């Protein structure tokens, strides 16, 4: 069984027992979270697609860790003007373990 959930402005296809990294969520490590924004639920050949959400469907997850992704380097330059600008960014994430999918 799998589901498509929406969190942090993105959509993720998840299955029970999977680990996923999502945009940072304000929750403690070990805390259980329930996602109600389920866009689709599938089980083999059967697929329920919501309009826009599947009513009564939930996905239960546990927070495993918080962290930062690898650094992304940004370099801007204007030719012949001696303008150079360097910038770096590390996006924060939350690692989740999918416990159950109901719906």
Swiss-Prot record:
Source organism (scientific name): Albidiferax ferrireducens (strain ATCC BAA-621 / DSM 15236 / T118)
Q: Does the keyword rRNA-binding apply?
A: yes
Q: Which family does it belong to?
A: Belongs to the bacterial ribosomal protein bL21 family.
**InterPro entries with a match to the protein in the record:** bL21-like, bL21-like_sf, Ribosomal_bL21, Ribosomal_bL21_CS
Q: Which PROSITE patterns match?
A: RIBOSOMAL_L21
Query: What is the gene called?
Result: rplU
Q: Which UniProt keywords apply?
A: Ribonucleoprotein, Ribosomal protein, RNA-binding, rRNA-binding
SUPFAM superfamilies under this entry?
L21p-like
Q: How does it assemble?
A: Part of the 50S ribosomal subunit. Contacts protein L20.
Q: Tell me a GO biological process for this protein.
A: translation
Entry GO MF terms: rRNA binding; structural constituent of ribosome
**GO annotations of cellular component type:** cytoplasm; ribonucleoprotein complex; ribosome
Q: What is this protein called?
A: Large ribosomal subunit protein bL21
Which purpose does this protein serve, as stated in its record?
This protein binds to 23S rRNA in the presence of protein L20.
């Amino acid at each position: 069984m799998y589901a498509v959930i929406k969190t942090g402005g993105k959509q993720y296809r998840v299955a029970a027992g999977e680990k996923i990294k999502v945009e940072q969520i304000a929750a403690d490590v070990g805390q259980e979270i329930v996602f109600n924004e389920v866009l689709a639920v599938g089980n083999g050949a059967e697929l329920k697609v919501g309009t826009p959400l599947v009513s009564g469907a939930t996905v239960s997850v546990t927070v495993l860790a918080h962290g930062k992704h690898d650094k992304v380097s940004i370099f801007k330059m204007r030719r012949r003007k001696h303008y150079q600008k360097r910038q770096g960014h590390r996006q924060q994430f939350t690692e989740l373990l999918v416990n159950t999918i109901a719906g």
